Swiss-Prot record:
Pfam families: TruB-C_2 (PF09157), TruB_C_2 (PF16198), TruB_N (PF01509). This is tRNA pseudouridine synthase B. The keyword DNA-binding does not apply. CDD domains: PseudoU_synth_EcTruB (cd02573), PUA_TruB_bacterial (cd21152). PANTHER family: PSEUDOURIDYLATE SYNTHASE TRUB1 (PTHR13767:SF2), TRNA-PSEUDOURIDINE SYNTHASE (PTHR13767). The gene is truB. It is an enzyme of class 5 (isomerase). The active site is at D54 (nucleophile). It comes from Cupriavidus taiwanensis (strain DSM 17343 / BCRC 17206 / CCUG 44338 / CIP 107171 / LMG 19424 / R1) (Ralstonia taiwanensis (strain LMG 19424)). Its EC number is 5.4.99.25. GO terms for biological process: mRNA pseudouridine synthesis; tRNA pseudouridine synthesis.
Amino acid sequence: MTDSNANRPPRLPRREVHGVLLLDKPLGLSSNDALVRAKRLLRAAKAGHTGTLDPLATGLLPLCFGEATKFSQDLLEADKTYDAEVRLGARSSTGDAEGELLDVRAVTCDRAAVEQALEGFIGEIEQVPPMHSALKKDGRPLYEYARAGQTVERAARRVTIRSIALLECALPGAPSFTMRVTCSKGTYIRTLAEDIGEALGCGAHLTGLRRIAVGDLTLDGAVTLAQIEAQDDAQRPAMLAPVDALLQKCVPVQLDAAAAGRFLQGQRIAQRDLPVGTALAENSLARVYAGEPSRLLGVARMREGALRPERLVKL
């Protein structure tokens, strides 16, 4: 009897890979499945994602590898920007195009009414999380209750819509429009679409969603899983942005060898030991480098006249 594994190529070992992959996630793939596939393609020893993106959404999914995982929480907290396609005239059972249409109504609004409605959602608002979401109630994801035909009480949550703009409007020819939304973490765009529909008096549901930015990271330079797979194995790690791509809001500080040694031991660096001209406000963050070429050592915070290490990296 032939061993079916005999003809398989040997599995290559994991390797140390550091950086952030700006992945353009395809439709229908969960964030976790995208992470598993990217980790396998890169043969990475350590990886983590920076917050989920619905399977029915496409677009930017930053994936952190190696030492970059130490900063993944920062992206979880960051604002997100989406392009959302909305259809007016009916709600749906899931809030998106996958659900059964409910409460079909006539659409009598025009572009001006849509623009006015959108403006009303800028700022801090309250949202009731949708039943078809991963948010947990009594230890179970809400979508499990929804699949069982149950509706449970959900507390409203406060989120912030930083900006919202009408990109395209098919009215009056077709009852649909596309908006660009920048919002705080935890915002449900499908719920926003439904609430806009109610404000317009005709109901609405989401028909498409694409994330175009997470904090300062954008789709510019993002790659697909197919593009990674097409690269030679040895070239794939070069598709990652460096760890400090996550730290661009931090002030760069270059230390000399002596100060760098103390910094890596967790010691604070006094202002007098920083490069001449270094100006850091109290409580501000710095990304710290040393050597030639410069190597990232970590992140520090300025407190009481000294730079204090907060997170060190080993690159």
